[in-house]
């Protein structure tokens, strides 16, 4: 993976070794043709040779050029899932937990691959850069800055309104429209304090990027218990147009593929 988050045009020797180690663990723990206790050395060697050949960086290899576009599409959908999971984790009832290094995209495999050292200097530099970044600039998602931005904004908001997250009730919200099944939404409310969380799911049905008019007529219905005066998005600080206590996803997700609406 390059510094900008884009994949390398060809696999490096280090990457090949990581995939071989991952496959060895998967095969041994499946215990079908080889295992840790009874290793099949020929089978293990054949697996390593197979991985080395399909990831051969030479021009003779026709597999990698076919794999890359598929991997890039999966990565985009995976990024949306990661953002949704992170937002739900930070706003749902309970205490959120973020594994070290996962403040941005983490391309680690299972252990021992996920025990590699975390580049904290890079994350520190990215965090400092957020002070001048605009939401639209974060649409270049491969570098992972959009995830760090989400975490920073929500954790700061949680700290400022701790009671809302500690004691606020959870209210599931209903979506309607063309892509009603492709979003999840809920509110947290404590007396006159509230937030409404909106995040995508099944994003391949909507298309990429998951913003603006792709959502068509999809809306979230807001409960009567929420005072909607001065409602705005936490991430973009934009006021949101509301009609009949409904918010259109084309408005709420016009810049970023997630939203936290609040009047605080």
Where do the model's predicted regions map?
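Carbohydrate-interacting/catalytic domains
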Residues: 1-264
């Amino acid at each position: 993976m390059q510094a900008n988050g884009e994949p390398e045009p060809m696999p490096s020797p280090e990457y090949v070794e990581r995939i071989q180690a991952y496959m060895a663990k998967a095969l041994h723990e499946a215990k079908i043709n080889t295992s840790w206790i009874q290793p099949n050395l020929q089978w293990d060697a054949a697996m390593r040779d197979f991985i080395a050949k399909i990831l051969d960086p030479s021009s003779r290899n026709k597999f990698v050029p076919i794999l890359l576009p598929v991997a890039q599409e999966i990565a985009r959908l995976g990024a949306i899932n990661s953002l949704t999971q992170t937002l739900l984790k930070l706003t749902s009832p309970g205490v959120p937990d973020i594994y070290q290094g996962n403040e941005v995209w983490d391309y680690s495999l299972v252990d021992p691959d996920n025990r590699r050292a975390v580049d904290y200097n890079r994350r520190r530099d990215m965090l400092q850069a957020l002070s001048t970044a605009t939401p639209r600039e974060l649409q270049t998602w491969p570098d992972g800055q959009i995830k760090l931005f989400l975490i920073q904004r929500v954790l700061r908001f949680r700290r400022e309104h701790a009671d809302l997250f500690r004691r606020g009730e959870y209210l599931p919200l209903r979506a309607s429209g063309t892509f009603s099944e492709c979003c999840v939404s809920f509110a947290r409310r404590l007396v006159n304090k509230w937030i409404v969380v909106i995040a995508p799911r099944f994003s391949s049905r909507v298309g990429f990027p998951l913003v603006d008019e792709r959502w068509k007529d999809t809306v979230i219905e807001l409960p009567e218990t929420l005072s909607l005066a001065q409602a705005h998005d936490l991430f973009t600080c934009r006021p949101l147009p509301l009609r009949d206590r409904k918010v259109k996803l084309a408005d709420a997700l016009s810049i970023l593929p997630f939203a936290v609406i609040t009047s605080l």
